[in-house]
């Protein structure tokens, strides 16, 4: 079951009021119970704030979570999963952390945290890091950060964390993802060609952190453009002819 804290966004995005969302919950949980469901899932929309109503505090979040948990308890089912749907990108790492800690303290049976946080203000990869540190296991991302929300007032600027950036972060933290980062970067380049404009990822432009044989040559010339920066994948030909920063090339060997 799902409820938006922001009634204004519920009306704009779902064409339903918050009250209508709540009123539909009883039928949903009853149908799940009749079908033999053994565990329930809840989704909290606009958890951290709204472009139309301002910020929402922790108590407001917990009140709405309690309402949904109780709906499941009314039919004898515990909740083991919660999803945060932050289409307007109000998340920040400290609010994610305080919310997850409060939920774990109050409802320890909720074990799975799903994060659908838009990257409107550029803080979402930090929010995802905070969630990773607390054991969240489900994260929504997109190639190059593509996405947006026409109902929140930010359009395409309300995109997502770029998949390639998040996978790079996970790999740096020693978390196996099953993704080939090099292929993700190539896919992000293809996506840019398809949509016809640059996307919002960083690792697809600067490359992963170079190690071992991939470290840059010390006599590399100036690298200015994004095209030239793609040498990590396309080789040194992309920056041939650029100026050298070394006035005395013997300094390279000193």
Which residues fall in each region the model found?
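Catalytic cores and adjacent flexible loops of soluble metabolic enzymes
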Residues: 1-254
């Amino acid at each position: 079951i799902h409820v938006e804290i922001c009634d204004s966004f519920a009306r704009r995005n779902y064409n339903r009021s918050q009250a209508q969302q709540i009123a539909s919950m009883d039928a949903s949980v009853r149908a799940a119970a009749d079908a033999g469901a053994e565990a329930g899932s809840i989704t909290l929309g606009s958890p951290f704030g709204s472009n139309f109503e301002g910020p929402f505090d922790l108590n407001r979040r917990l009140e709405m979570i309690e309402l949904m948990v109780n709906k499941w308890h009314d039919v004898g089912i515990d909740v083991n999963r919660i999803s945060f749907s932050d289409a307007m990108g109000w998340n920040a790492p400290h609010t994610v952390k305080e919310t997850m800690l409060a939920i774990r303290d109050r409802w320890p049976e909720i074990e799975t945290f799903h994060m659908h946080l838009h990257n409107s203000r550029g803080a979402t990869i930090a929010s995802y890091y905070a969630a990773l540190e607390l054991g969240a296991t489900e994260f929504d991302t997109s190639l190059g950060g593509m996405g947006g929300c026409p109902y929140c007032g930010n359009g395409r600027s309300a995109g997502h964390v770029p998949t390639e950036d998040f996978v790079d972060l996970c790999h740096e933290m020693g978390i196996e993802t099953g993704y080939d980062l090099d292929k993700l970067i190539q896919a992000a380049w293809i996506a840019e060609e398809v949509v016809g404009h640059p996307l919002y990822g960083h690792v697809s432009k600067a490359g992963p952190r170079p190690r071992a044989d991939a470290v840059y040559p010390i006599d590399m010339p100036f690298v200015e453009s994004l095209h030239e920066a793609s040498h990590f994948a396309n080789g040194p030909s992309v920056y041939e002819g650029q100026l050298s920063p070394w006035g005395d090339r013997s300094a390279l060997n000193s």
